Amino acid sequence: MTIVFRLEPGCLGPDGKQYIEEFCLLVQRAFAQKTVGIVQWEIIPRYDKLLPETEYRLGERGFSRDKAQRYLNACGKDLDTLESQLNLALPRMIEQYLARD
């Protein structure tokens, strides 16, 4: 299963559009190491605000959050926990990224 998470460029400040692609790759790499197995993260910029912040996919097929939760529960994982880990880590990662210069 793939969890697609879109990050707003503004989370990196007024010049965020310049850095968001690189930052998304860093976040994706970090979470790929933490969630080995049935879950893959796709962290991408959210340039289009009409697209949802989070999507759930199995192959090319998208499905609802409820179905994603049931799928993960059947595999012994919890969607709330996975999303919480990302949401807790993001502010720290943003802070570290902005302090890199």
Report the location of each language-model feature.
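Short, flexible N-terminal segments of the mature chain
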Residues: 16-37
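Surface-exposed beta-strand edges and their flanking turn/coil or helix-capping segments
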Residues: 18-20, 56, 71
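A cross-taxonomic marker for long C-terminal extensions/tails that follow the last structured domain
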Residues: 72-101
